[in-house]
Swiss-Prot record:
InterPro entries: FN3_dom, FN3_sf, Ig-like_fold. Residues 175-277 form the Fibronectin type-III domain. This is Fibronectin type III domain-containing protein 8.
Length: 321
């Protein structure tokens, strides 16, 4: 109504009032429209998933609301962007964790250390160590702990204030039993001897082999060993190869095992003989080899009680010989 009234007036002063009134109305019209909240608008733009509009339809949002979206604001001004990868401050103790290493000695370790010093072992030291049981130490008081969380072995209370727990690392008490020679392969100058040792028995650190040459004076006399034997020490395996033997010669061999407790007994003498050399019958590049195998005899023990003995007596009366 105001604009139509001013158009009817035609003098110069009223034209000036018309222009100023239009400017005021335009300013009021701009202030009447709600100003969009940049942060609330930014929530729609920065979200990766496509949201529905306030009108309740995805189609309406695409057709009607797309033109009303404001320009994309920088992510640094947004408070709820899904691309936010900020990391909360971490504690200094997590950046520099304390690393602990726990080790326990085992029997193989001690066997390797004491392998070459069996003669220096004393029975008193072994008996004293066995009273403590196993080698796992459990500190019970703070006085035994050195700075840094390590066990103080210089503290005399460690020997008295420790508890033994089941462990695989135990002190060896008994010497190993005698091995059994099970196989040998001979030629005219070499011999490969193998022996067995029952698993589950005393632990073995190494073996010792003694070899002697047997000489026959007459056919009716028993063989006699020479006074100069060969001794092979610290054999880790259960097979040995003897080189540079005399052809067509008899030898006598015996083996024993050793561990940290000492050396065991020698096995029964094992006799073998090398093959005779006959260059006319067999070529030199194809020598003869003979292999002999044997099994350890099995012993079975039968125990009978009083009732079993009475049953046997009754059977004797019923079925006499």
């Amino acid at each position: 109504m105001a604009s139509e009234t001013f158009y009817k007036v035609g003098d110069g002063e009223e034209a000036m009032l018309k222009k100023e009134t239009l400017n005021v109305l335009n300013a009021l019209d701009q202030m009447s429209k709600p100003f969009p909240n940049p942060k609330s608008m930014n929530r729609t733009v920065t979200t990766k998933s496509l949201p529905l509009s306030s009108r309740g339809s995805l189609v309406n949002f695409l057709e009607e609301d797309a033109i009303n979206l404001p320009k994309h604001m920088p992510l640094e001004d947004s408070e709820c962007s899904s691309d936010d990868t900020s990391i909360s401050p971490m504690s200094s103790t997590l950046l520099n964790p304390i690393k602990l290493a726990v080790t326990q000695p085992n029997s193989r370790f001690f066997a390797g250390m004491l392998e070459g010093e069996l003669n220096k072992l004393s029975l008193s030291s072994i008996a004293k160590s066995t009273e403590k049981g196993h080698l796992a130490l459990c500190p019970q008081s703070k006085s035994q702990m050195a700075p840094g969380g390590l066990l103080d072995f210089d503290n005399p209370e460690v020997d008295t204030d420790t508890s033994s727990t089941p462990s695989e690392s135990s002190v060896v008490l008994d010497v190993p039993e005698a091995p059994f020679v099970c196989e040998h392969t001979v030629s005219d100058s070499t011999a490969v001897i193998s022996w067995t040792y029952a698993p589950g028995k005393q632990q073995v650190s190494f073996y010792q082999v003694l070899l002697q040459e047997v000489v026959r004076k007459n056919s009716g006399e028993t063989p006699k060993a020479k006074n100069r034997p060969w001794i092979f020490n610290k054999i880790l395996g259960t097979t040995v190869k003897l080189m540079e033997l005399k052809p067509n010669t008899s030898y006598c061999l015996t083996v024993r095992a050793a561990n940290t407790a000492g050396v065991g007994t020698w096995c029964k003498p094992y006799k073998f003989a090398t093959v005779a050399t006959d260059l006319n019958s067999f070529p030199e590049n194809n020598p003869i080899q003979i292999t002999v195998q044997r099994k350890e005899p099995q012993r079975k023990t039968v125990s009978l009680g009083l009732e079993d003995m009475r049953r046997l007596e009754d059977l004797e009366h019923l079925f006499p010989y």
